From Swiss-Prot:
Stretches for region K/R-ring: 128-131, 264-268
Modified residues (Asymmetric dimethylarginine): 460
UniProt entry keywords in alphabetical sequence: Calcium, Calcium transport, Disulfide bond, Ion transport, Membrane, Metal-binding, Methylation, Mitochondrion, Mitochondrion inner membrane, Phosphoprotein, Repeat, Transit peptide, Transport
Taxonomic source organism: Ailuropoda melanoleuca
Phylogenetic classification of the source organism: Eukaryota, Metazoa, Chordata, Craniata, Vertebrata
Region annotation (Polybasic region) ranges: 101-112
Positions with biased composition (Basic and acidic residues): 69-82
Gene3D superfamilies: EF-hand
GO BP, sorted A to Z: calcium import into the mitochondrion; calcium ion import; mitochondrial calcium ion homeostasis; mitochondrial calcium ion transmembrane transport; positive regulation of cristae formation; positive regulation of mitochondrial calcium ion concentration; regulation of cellular hyperosmotic salinity response
Domain of life: Eukaryota
Protein name (database record): Calcium uptake protein 1, mitochondrial
């Protein structure tokens, strides 16, 4: 079709040109020939455009050519439905493994967006992190609005390489009007009844004050809370009331000011992200009872911390779309290395080791994953125990790791979990663990990167240089004896 139109148009142009330059035709004929030539060129352009549009419609989708239609405009509705059914059937037959689905999403644009979001997690203030990763703005009946995170948003805000959903970003939210009955019906959507997020109120949603409190709980070691409770337990009975607890763990307190989040936070009334004077009403009721006259023991608070860590780990596990309650070995390795800070080339090599060892892996259940992370909670004691083995000349093999887990953390590590860990950290392939690298990476994984300072180090570098210059000048000023 394109070839016929082109040949006819060129023939018309050739005839018109000869007649025009020959001078044998009158002026009216020349104009008529020019009009025919113009119409022929227009027909060629139109036919070329139609053919190009059809070629785009029939080509597979790509980054620059997203497929938005299933056929030409001339196709009727029934043909479109048949195509849809055939496409769905083909997708069912050729449905890839869940891990393969996740590989296809990381294009060039996605990688750059994830790098930008990782910088936000690493260097931005808590206010900006919250405003970027929160996805809901609830408007109440008087017209006042407040921004909230869902539990999934909270996990995404502390997990590297987890991309924010499209069209949601800094100060971009999904708007929800306050309707008590409707919100109550959607409660299960945000948090399960057994989840610690359910106790926060607001249907399991997380306000800015809750966000700071939860990150403080996650980033503070258990030993620090034990010391803080003893400091503010004035009568020494092992219990604190609400006033004493607010001094120890709420806005403006000692513990929060020692965390990287707390040191970076500044109240910003313009954005509405200011820390309130106390815990939310749901948490105070959870800790101190309905009348707020109860006592909180360190045992109960550490149980709250344990439940929070369990719920966050559960959300991380479910994010990998487990099949029959299991995730793949590579996904488990990704969970272990998420906060490692390992260079990309080495990270790729470690992932290839897993792929080589577990081509047809049997997967890991949540119970196996939770047991290993319970083992990691005692990583300092594990480090000491492994050092003793190393100094005694014993090899750090899988049996040794299982023995340390039983002795230190009181958990059983399955043989399959140990196989995955050794495939990651057995650098020379001799069946022995690289102790230092394993412990350093696992310490970062336990704290989820929340203990790192939220700056690029320039201020600390200048302070160190200034201190060095002062000491050097003082040494020059003093006479040598």
């Amino acid at each position: 079709m394109f070839r016929l139109h082109s040949l006819s148009a060129l023939a018309e142009l050739a005839v018109g040109s000869r007649c025009y330059h020959g001078g044998s035709q009158p002026t009216q004929m020349k104009r008529r020939l020019m009009m025919v030539a113009f119409l022929g060129a227009s027909a060629v352009t139109a036919s070329t455009g139609l053919l190009w549009k059809r070629a785009l419609a029939e080509s597979p989708p790509s980054v620059n050519n997203p497929k938005s239609e299933l056929g030409d405009k001339g196709k009727n509705k029934d043909e479109g439905e048949v195509c849809n059914h055939e496409k769905k059937a083909a997708d069912v037959c050729l449905e890839p493994h869940p891990e393969e689905k996740k590989k296809k999403r990381s294009g060039f644009r996605d990688r750059k967006v994830m790098e930008y979001e990782n910088r936000i997690r690493a260097y931005s203030t808590p206010d900006k992190i919250f405003r970027y990763f929160a996805t809901l703005k609830v408007i109440n009946e008087p017209g006042e609005s407040e921004v909230f995170m869902t539990p999934q948003d909270f996990v995404r805000s502390i997990t590297p390489n987890e991309k924010q959903p499209e069209h949601l970003g800094l100060d971009q939210y999904t708007i929800k009007r306050f309707d008590g009955k409707k919100i109550a019906q959607e409660r299960e959507k945000f948090a399960d009844e057994g989840s610690i997020f359910y106790t926060l109120g607001e249907c399991g949603l997380i306000s800015f004050s809750d966000y700071i409190f939860l990150t403080t709980v996650l980033s503070t070691p258990q030993r620090n809370f034990e010391i803080a409770f003893k400091m503010f337990d004035l009568n020494g009975d092992g219990e604190v009331d609400m006033e004493e607890f607010e001094q120890a763990s709420c806005p403006g307190n000692i513990i929060r000011s020692q965390t990287s989040m707390g040191m970076r936070h500044r109240d910003r009334p313009t954005t509405g992200n200011t820390l309130k004077s106390g815990l939310c009403s749901a948490l105070t009721t959870y800790f101190f009872g309905a009348d707020l006259k109860g006592k909180l023991t360190i045992k109960n608070f550490l149980e709250f911390q344990r439940k929070l860590q369990h719920d966050v780990l559960k959300l991380e596990f479910e994010r990998h779309d487990p099949v029959d309650g299991k995730i793949t070995e590579r996904q488990f390795g990704g969970m272990l290395l998420a906060y490692s800070g390992v260079q990309s080339k080495k990270l790729t090599a470690m992932q290839k080791q897993l792929k080589k060892h577990f081509k047809e892996g049997k997967g890991l259940t949540f119970q196996e994953v939770e047991n290993f992370f319970t083992f990691l909670k005692n990583i300092n004691d594990v480090d000491t125990a492994l050092s003793f083995y190393h100094m005694a000349g014993a090899s750090l093999d899988k049996v040794t790791m299982q023995q340390v887990a039983r002795t230190v953390a009181k958990v059983e590590l399955s043989d399959h979990v140990c196989d995955v860990v050794f495939a990651l950290f057995d650098c020379d392939g001799n069946g022995e663990l690289s102790n230092k690298e394993f412990v350093s990476i696992m310490k970062q994984r336990l704290m989820r990167g929340l203990e790192k300072p939220k700056d690029m180090g320039f201020t600390r570098l200048m302070q160190a240089m200034w201190k060095c210059a002062q000491e050097t000048a003082w040494d020059f000023a003093l006479p040598k004896q």
